[in-house]
């Protein structure tokens, strides 16, 4: 009898290690292996180092306390793991497809072998030997088919595991992105809070507490209304139960039992009415307490706002005191008195038309031009060229408060630009038109606030200040211009 040799290709299968990336590799030749590449440790989740069903609550709480920098680093690491998982998934699909095709090929070989088995003269002569060879071939093919099927099923399982791990990484990435967004929002709010002074923070806290108190009051009010409806319903039911007891129908068998049942129902309804009434009274007490909380919160908010206003008034007063002191130190006490006089007269004053103010200023400027050299003019232009509008806006806000007006910071840039162009070209009308637009609501005080902001925030020099005060004076009257002329010796 011929020796039967199993020539089926060797098919190796390496068991999956929990917590690893599933990968595949189809070797050259007839050997096909299914392997697992070790994944990154401690990624999160249960069921393995790489991650199972979900991250533990402790890990999530710990991650929630990370800074934005830590979360961003963690996010980058997760992105790398996600890329590795996608690569592993692609390899697993390739492995599954290769092994599935291998199974199909083996099955087809078996089918062809069975189909080709027809008796011949030689086969009949060696029937016993051929039967044994045929059985050996059948067993070999059956064994190879079973082995290929098991490997194909293992590859399919590895593919499912790779997909699960990919989805788990995606879930973890979404969680990290959510935590990062919350951390960034918290940091932004902290930075905003840190930029506020104590009085502003007190107002914010009081506003928040008032909003919370109002929300609690609304909730309590809703509870009272709900319980009032219940009391109203039970009161109607109690009235009907009382009527049923009061109407006594006798003379039929068992009427006493019916009467007792009605009396029990009446007592039950009385007990229920007492219970819901007590609940309503309790809800009303809570509602009234919440009303008191709202009133107290409103008082606290008013106190905080009053403290803020006092602080702002003090700040604005300090600003103006510092402003006049600066003018005194730089240009003398007389100049400081003129500035104070301009500020005082500007309060509540209505301004002249652009043409009137410009005509008054031109007379003053024509004389002033003879005093200002090109070097002085260039210095004023350069100072206006390098204005820090952030600092200028702070000065405007403080000066405006001291004059009890509000000013739009956006006008500062327009005034600065027109002022600079006027120094360069000698055309002052655009500046006066801009000043008129800015002051249309509150009058000359707005012009004073705008122009005084430039005195504080821009190193204009003596002649630059003379121009600024001349512009302001032209809106107030000839008396102020005459004082300036006398002071400047023109």
Curated annotation (Swiss-Prot):
Location comes to: Host membrane
Single GO molecular-function term? pore-forming activity
- Record's compositionally biased regions (Basic and acidic residues): 146-170
User: Which coarse location class describes where this protein primarily resides?
Assistant: host cell
Annotated region Disordered: the residues are 1-29, 146-171
InterPro entries per the record? Channel_colicin_C, Channel_colicin_C_sf
The superkingdom listed in its UniProt entry is Bacteria
Record GO biological process:
defense response to Gram-negative bacterium; killing of cells of another organism
Q: Which Pfam families match?
A: Colicin
Q: Name one GO cellular component term.
A: membrane
Membrane-spanning regions, if any? 447-467
Question: Could you tell me what this protein does?
Answer: This colicin is a channel-forming colicin. This class of transmembrane toxins depolarize the cytoplasmic membrane, leading to dissipation of cellular energy. Colicins are polypeptide toxins produced by and active against E.coli and closely related bacteria.
Q: Which family does it belong to?
A: Belongs to the channel forming colicin family.
What name appears for this protein in its UniProt entry? Answer: Colicin-5
């Amino acid at each position: 009898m011929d020796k039967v040799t199993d020539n089926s290709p060797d098919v190796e299968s390496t068991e999956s290690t929990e917590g690893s990336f599933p990968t595949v590799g189809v070797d050259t030749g007839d050997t096909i292996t299914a392997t697992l590449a070790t994944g990154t440790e401690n990624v999160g989740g249960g069921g393995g180092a790489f991650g199972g069903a979900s991250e533990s609550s402790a890990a999530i709480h710990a991650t929630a306390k990370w800074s934005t920098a830590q979360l961003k680093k963690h996010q980058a690491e997760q992105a790398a793991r996600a890329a590795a998982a996608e690569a592993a998934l692609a390899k697993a699909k390739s492995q599954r497809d290769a092994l599935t095709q291998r199974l199909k090929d083996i099955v087809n070989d078996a089918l062809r072998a069975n189909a080709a088995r027809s008796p011949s003269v030689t086969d009949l002569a060696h029937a016993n030997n051929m039967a044994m060879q045929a059985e050996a071939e059948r067993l070999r093919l059956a064994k190879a088919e079973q082995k290929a099927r098991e490997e194909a099923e293992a590859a399919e399982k590895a593919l499912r595991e790779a997909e699960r791990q990919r989805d788990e990484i995606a879930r973890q990435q979404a969680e990290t992105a959510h935590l990062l967004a919350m951390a960034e929002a918290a940091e932004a709010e902290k930075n905003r809070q840190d930029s506020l002074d104590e009085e502003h923070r007190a107002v914010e806290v009081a506003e928040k507490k008032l909003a919370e108190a109002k929300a609690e009051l609304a909730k309590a009010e809703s509870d009272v209304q709900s319980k009032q409806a219940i009391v109203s319903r039970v009161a109607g039911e109690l009235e009907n139960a009382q009527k049923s007891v009061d109407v006594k129908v006798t003379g039929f068998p068992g009427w006493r039992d019916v009467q007792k049942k009605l009396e029990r129902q009446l007592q039950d309804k009385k007990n229920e009415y007492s219970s819901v009434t007590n609940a309503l009274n309790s809800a009303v007490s809570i509602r009234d307490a919440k009303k008191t909380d709202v009133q107290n919160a409103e008082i606290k908010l008013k106190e905080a706002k009053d403290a803020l206003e006092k602080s702002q008034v003090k700040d604005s007063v300090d600003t103006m005191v510092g402003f006049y002191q600066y003018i005194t130190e730089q240009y003398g006490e007389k100049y400081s008195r003129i500035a104070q006089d301009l500020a005082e007269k500007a309060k509540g004053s209505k301004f002249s038309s652009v043409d009137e103010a410009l005509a008054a200023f031109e007379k003053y400027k024509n004389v002033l031009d003879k005093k200002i050299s090109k070097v002085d003019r260039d210095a004023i232009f350069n100072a206006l060229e390098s204005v820090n509008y952030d600092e200028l806006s702070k000065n405007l806000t403080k000066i405006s408060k001291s004059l009890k007006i509000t000013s739009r910071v956006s006008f500062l840039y327009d005034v600065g630009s027109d002022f600079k162009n006027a120094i360069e070209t000698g055309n002052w009308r655009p500046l006066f038109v801009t000043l008129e637009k800015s002051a249309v609501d509150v009058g000359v005080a707005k012009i004073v606030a705008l122009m005084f902001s430039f005195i504080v925030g821009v190193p204009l020099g003596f002649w630059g200040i003379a121009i600024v005060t001349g512009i302001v004076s032209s809106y107030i009257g000839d008396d102020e211009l005459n004082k300036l002329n006398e002071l400047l010796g023109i």
